[in-house]
Amino acid sequence: MARAESLTKGRPPAAVRVGQAGVADDSGTRRTEILHTAASLIASSGLRTSLQEIADAAGILPGSLYHHFDSKEAILIELIRRYQEDLNRIGQTAQARLDEPDSRPVPEKIIELGSAIANCAVQHGAALQMSFYEGPSADPELMKLTQQPPMAIQEAMLQTLRAGRWSGYIKPDIDLPTLADRICQTMLQVGLAVMRHNSSADQVAELLCRIILQGLAARSPTDSALDRSNAFAAANGVIETWADDRDANPSDKAAHVLAVARMEFGRRGYEVTTIRDIASAAGLGTGTVYRVIGSKDELLASIMESFGRKVEAGWVSVLRSDATPVEKLDALSWVNVNALDRFSDEFRIQLAWMRQSPPNTPNPGWLYATRLRQMKSLLSEGIRAGEISAGPPSTTMLARCVIGLQWIPENILRAVGKRAALVHARDTVLRGVAVRAK
C-alpha cells in the first residue's frame, strides 16, 4: 500500500481543490464569532456545553447572547446548516468537474473527493458530531437537519465510481451506490479524532481510500476460504453464546431495569428518556430504579460496558484462534456485523455517549485502547509475514482506520443483510474494490 502522503504532496488542501469548504463563513460579524466560539467549545467539551459557557467564552452576557440566538438549539441548527452547505458545495463542484477533461488516474480522483469531504468534516467537527451521532430532539427543525443524508457528496462519489468502472478500474460485481455511501460515511468519520487522532485529514482520507480500493490483503482471499477459517469458527462460537438481555428475569430487579432501559433508550433516545420513563416501563417506583441503577449516566456506562464485553469476548476468541492475520481480520468484521445486528439498541445508546463526548476524544467507548493495541499487534504480524500490504509509517494510524472500517454503517447492514454486509467488509477491507493487476 502506498504511503498516505504520496498523492497529496505539492497540492493545495483538498477542501480548496474541490468545493472550497468554508466559503459559507461570513467572518467578522458578532453572530459568526458566537458560532465559532460555540463550535470550539463543543469540540473540546461535547454537546453538554451550556449557553452560559458559550456566553462566557464569547465575552458577553447570556442576555446579550439571546439577541443573536434564542436557544442553544438555534446555535446547533446554524452550525449544522453551514456544515451541510459546505458539503453540498463540495458535491456540486465535484459533479460539475466530472464533465471536464481529466487525465488523472481514477484513484487520485476518488482520493481527492474523499479528502475534500474529510477536511470539511474536520472543519465542522461540532456539526459533524450532531449529524453523525444523530439523536432525538425536542426541536423538529434540528431533528430534520440531522437526519438529512449528504446527497450531493454521495451522488458525486457515485458518479466518480461509475467513471472508474467504465474505465475498468472498479470490479464489475461491486454495488456502487452502497460503496459510495460507505466511502462518504467513512470520510466523514475522519472529522472525529477516534479515526484521525494526530494525523492530518488528507493523510487519513488517502489511507482509508487506498484500503477500500486496494485492500489490506497481499493476496485476495476467497469467501469460501474465509468461511472455513478457524478464526471464523471462533467468532461464530462466541456469537452463539450471546444472550438477549431483553429476556432478563423480572425477579432480578437490576437486570430487569437494565433490559427495560435499553429498550427505552433505543426507542426514545438516551437524551430524552427520563428515569421516570424507565420506572414506568419497568413497573417500578422511581426511587427503586434510582436505588438499583443510580443515575442515568451510571446506567449508560453500565450498558456500554455490557455491550463492550460482548464484543470483547469475540475479539479474544478470534485473536487466540489458529488462523492467519487476514483470517482474523475477517472474523473480527463478522463479530462486529453480528453485534450491530443483534444489539442495535446498545449500539445506538453507545452513540448517545459519543454525542455527549467531544469530537476530539481519541479513545472513546469501552476498552477502545485495548482494541487499538490488539489491532496494531495483529497488523504488524501480518505485515511481517507478508500477508498484509505495508501501510503508512504509523501502525497506530493504520489500526485506527481498520477498526473504523470494520464497523459497517447500520443503514447498509439493514439494507443488505448480514451476509452481504460481511462480503462488503471483505471487499472494502481485505480484497479492495479495484481490479488487481495480474
List the model feature ranges, each with a label.
Residues 1-18, 119, 123, 155, ...:
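C-terminal peripheral helix-coil segments that are non-catalytic and often amphipathic
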Residues 33, 37, 43-74, 78, ...:
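Helix-turn-helix
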Residues 310-314, 331, 338-435:
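C-terminal structured domain segments across diverse proteins
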Residues 81-88, 305-313:
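Short, basic, alpha-helical segments at the C-terminal edge of helix-turn-helix-like DNA-binding modules
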Residues 118-144, 158, 229, 328, ...:
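Amphipathic alpha-helical segments used for helix-helix packing
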Residues 78, 92-127, 176, 205, ...:
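Hydrophobic alpha-helical connector segments
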Residues 47-48, 170, 388:
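Conserved hydrophobic residue
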Residues 130, 140-167, 176-180, 184, ...:
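Amphipathic alpha-helical packing segments from all-alpha helical-bundle domains
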